[in-house]
Amino acid sequence: MNIVNDKLMAKGVINAIGTVTTLGGNVLSDEVLTSIREVSGKFVDMEQLAEEAGNYIARKVGAESAYITNGASSAIVLSVAACLIRAKPDLRYKLPKLEGGKKYVLTFKNQVNEFKYLISISGAKIKEIGDRNGVSVVNFENTVRKFADKTAAIVYFALDPLPNNLVIEKVVEIAHSFGIPVIVDAAAELPPKDNLRKYLRSGVDVVIFSGGKAIGSFSDTGIMLGTKEIIDIVRGIGPYREEISDSGRRVFLGRVMKVSKEEIVATTVAFDKFLKMDEEAFMLTMYQKCETILKCLGKNNSLSARVINPPWYFPRPVTIPRVEIDFKNGIDADKIVNKLKNNNPPIYCLSDKGKLYLNPQCLKEGEEKIISEAILRLTERELRGE
């Protein structure tokens, strides 16, 4: 009996959406799997392992410090929490229930995403700046000045090419003039690899990446790069820190965000492999996969297809091209997307504004043809009214 297939019903799907959490993030390479087997039979000092892994990653990209977290979302919570107690480290005993002090975290209202509320898990209060159309430099600076004595950090969600977005360099310049640290959530902003260094060059205090997307580690891992000051505070409230006093043993906020030894090692190995990747060849492969889909679809009176660079609000990163399919003759793209999930094997893709989109990033060899044939088959059935 195959437990994965027969008991868990995990027979796998064709992923034409991307490295999204809901489809498992990414697949693990042979090198990563080997590293997991090597460490899984050992006991280790977890705090030491976490520090050594962080130091290794930091050296690779020229960061002061680095830390592997339980996903990028945990990195948001921990980095914000570190900023909340930055001036008063003893407040770590009270997280997330803080009273007084700098509790505000400023964010941008036009940087719309589902992860913003995670900031509040740290105990912070979210204060949005501007509106859905962005904010001017003058208004941003005035708002920062107004709330500076109550603000612990500014969180910036990397969503280029978001229209009317303040550039990160200007955000850092103004924030630092008031002594406020800047945290960037760039979880899915790889490739390009240069983004690992781009935000560090801009002077941000922390930049966060998912370990389970382009980097290729477990889906529930994240990487925090930044200043030694803030990441040292994160270690102090992290999952491996314990204190013993007369009242007993004490753990901290990060205890609920544990990262296993296997995940730490896997993320370090995956990170190293990602840095060595031939990015030009990778991007060429992405475009070739898209062209293969176009070729398999062929000329069809019921649809037209082309390769596009997606808009900012699509699943990240938007550096990866997409195949856009525009159906004709009244065929509903949403309906096709839902029916593809019932294909054998199931195919997961997205629709937006009446069009269907295919992301080549997670497609295995030969899946381009399977997807194309399924779409053509469903299109014919729709025309017949089936």
Task: Show which residues each predicted segment covers.
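Short strand->helix junction
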Residues: F43, P161, E189, K364-E365
